[in-house]
Amino acid sequence: MTFQTFKNCVIAIALCMMAGVSIKAQEPSQMQALIGQSLSKLQQQTPDAHLNCIAELKRVEAMFPDSIQPKYQMALQSLSFSVANPKAEQTENLLKEAEQTIDKMEQMKGADQSDVCTLRGFLYMVRIVQDPAVNGQRYYMNVMQNYEKALKINPNNQLAQQLQQKFLEGMKQATGSN
């Protein structure tokens, strides 16, 4: 009888451990599904859709606080909203939150530093878009250094390449250079 109890206890422990492993294995796919669901809101290119997406990404980040991907997407979408709507009332808070998120990501083990530098460069780029006359000279080097560092770490970082190109084109237009 004791052996049967022991056997049942071992089976119960094994099942609990397997369930725990199964739940942990499902977390990344569940997280990815939630992120994808949030990003699908961006099919409507409206400020409200963008803000709803960001709010959902914040909830996903709260569910998975040790994961980098929700933080990355939340910061990226906050910056995307801010560059498209530099004078919106939500922009300043979104930029502060994005900066805090980038700072957190920078300290996280396993964070892609190329992505962190890209986001930081994008943050400074948005600051320039907000007020080019004041922030252009202040943040120009920060933008360039962050994109260059991102591309030095990962030369295949498509977002860093695209943002750097857009920034250089915008600066040429702003200064009248060819």
Protein language model features and the residues they cover:
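Residue-level recognition of tetratricopeptide repeat
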Residues: 67, 112-113, 156-157
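Short coil/turn linking the two alpha-helices of tandem helical-hairpin repeats
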Residues: 38-47, 80-89, 121, 126-135, ...
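Helix-turn-helix repeat elements of alpha-solenoid scaffolds
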Residues: 43-58, 90-101, 137-141
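Structural marker of alpha-solenoid helical repeat scaffolds
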Residues: 63, 108-109, 153
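N-terminal leader/linker segments that initiate helical-solenoid repeat arrays
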Residues: 23-64, 68, 72-73
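Bacterial Sec-dependent N-terminal signal peptides
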Residues: 1-31
